[in-house]
Amino acid sequence: MSLIHLIYFPTILSLILGTEGTPALTYGNLADNQHGNEEQGDVDMYPLYECSKKGAGVSSNNWYGACRGACSMTKNTTDVHMEIYYRNDSVGWIDVLSIQTTEIWKHSHVTWYGECEHNTKYGSSNTAPVSVILERLEFLHNGMSSWPYGHSIHVHDTISSPDCSYFDDVSRSGWRLIISKRALELKSDIAGEGYIVDPDVGYVYPVADGIGKGRTWHVWKASSVPSSGCYFKSAGITNCTLLMDTFLYSCPSLNIAFSARVGKHIKSTCVGDMNISTDGVTYQTLGSTDQGSISTQLVSLWHQSQEALIQQLILTINEALGKIETSYCESTCDLTEMLISQHTEHPMVIETPVGPWLPYSIDGKVSVLPCQGGQDLVVIKPIEICASPFMLKVKSLKSLDTYWWVPTDSHVAPFTQCSNRDDEEMIIKIQRKKPLIFEFWRGAYKLDYPYNSSGIWLDNPGGHIHRSSKWFPTLDSLSYSSPINLPLISKGIRKHIQAIVSTTEITSGGNVTSWTHSISTIAEAMFDSAAIAAGRVVMWWYTLEESVKRYLTVAFGLVLTVITIWAMSKLFFRSSPTYARAPTNIEWVRS
């Protein structure tokens, strides 16, 4: 399997107008002998779309109904002025006391000398009854503001040592509370009720309870919920069209369409009364207007004209234009639905009359994810690279979220993750001195051996992304407020490759020019897997900070010194061999 797969789709525009799209540079793997131009400073590298989590998708049938409904020019429509919200799961932080409890027994005893002795015995760590914690809530709340965070432990016994009695030993039983303080994230559910998640076992505690039981007891002040933290955050105020044939709200300005059926009505939230649709969208209706059909609106507008003939002429022309426009729009929906139904493992974002969408499939069922087309995604500097598969780290300037971007895609999504594995195919190509090709949706970047100079850019004439207005497909030029061009990205790629090259064979005239290669060559002659392991160790060393390298060098030197001293001591101080004592009487033998 190649390092990266390059897959492009023809544009909707070429399908609608019947023209042949410009073919892509290649399909699948790019050839090693492909030629191109030197790096171009004006080739900007960005994903265009930010797509949602897979759980936010809608079925292809619902999407198709919303798309066709948006094309209706002759049916009566109702415009609803509404505000759309999304859940602001994290609304702040709250101080929580974690309380570990142990059963204890305290005894008093009078000695033979008349002294009073006290001692304490401890049982195993058990969870105390809730009554023990509730009886000391005031004490715990008072200490919450003064006790430090972290693992600083405050110990509190629920009983004191009993007074001594001259007639008998006295015993009491109770509990020892070992208390630590930390701040936990305060979250909210869909109904706007705050809750806390136990980080140890994952239990969920309603914030209004003030107490929760997991492996230990947890206590917090229910009244300490941040007043500024609202459970819902506005996604925007917009006009949505109620499509009666599918009973969906279509909100083109927010790129969203959802069911008009109310699944749940919530009262008195932090933003007022709200509706939750059957497909999970939270919104408030601010008013509605019956718009009627386009023709009806034109008649009411032009009724003020005294020229009946001109009025009729304008009406006729606009009805004709409306039918043409509707035809184009519905064709776009039909063709897009066909592309969605032919979902592949490497789909593209498709612009539609109801916004951009990304097809995906789960258990054989095709759905689409809503995407945002705002040009606010930038490549992070310094460049961060994932080796397998090849990805770049990007950041949203609006939400400040970071994503791993597969450069062959025009979109990013939160479910794309880096595996942090070395790419074996790339290592083999480096060992064979083959060109390395990094593919993007607008072309490919080719880096020739020895990988220490500027590469070349292979333009992809078919790498355009279909972008449309609400009705007619158009191709818009791209513009960015913070441009990141190819040289900046290629510099990061070359730096990443050099880290790999330092562990592979780099020869010049038969002489080894890298000391790290000697390790790799000897190991490879013995066993291939050992060579790869040694190379990875050296690559790991190459990526360490200088300060870390110094500490490790000192530690290794100390270990080596200790071993050497031990070996020398064994050599010089080993015991001498035993010798038998010579006899004192010598018997001479005479001939």
Curated annotation (Swiss-Prot):
PTM annotation: Glycosylatedby host. Glycosylation is crucial for glycoprotein export at the cell surface.
Keyword Transcription in annotation: no
GO annotation, biological process: symbiont entry into host cell; virion attachment to host cell
Intravirion side: 574-591
GO CC annotations, alphabetized: membrane; viral envelope; virion membrane
Primary subcellular site in the record, as a coarse category: virion
Membrane topology: Single-pass type I membrane protein
UniProt signal peptide: 1-21
Compartments (UniProt record): Virion membrane
Key words of the record: Glycoprotein, Host-virus interaction, Membrane, Signal, Transmembrane, Transmembrane helix, Viral attachment to host cell, Viral envelope protein, Virion, Virus entry into host cell
Transmembrane segments: 553-573
Virion surface membrane side: 22-552
Functional note: Attaches the virus to host cellular receptor, inducing endocytosis of the virion. In the endosome, the acidic pH induces conformational changes in the glycoprotein trimer, which trigger fusion between virus and cell membrane.
Subunit structure: Homotrimer. Interacts with matrix protein.
Family note: Belongs to the nucleorhabdovirus glycoprotein family.
Protein name: Glycoprotein
Organism (species): Maize mosaic virus (isolate Maize/United States/Reed/2005)
Name of the gene this protein is made from: G
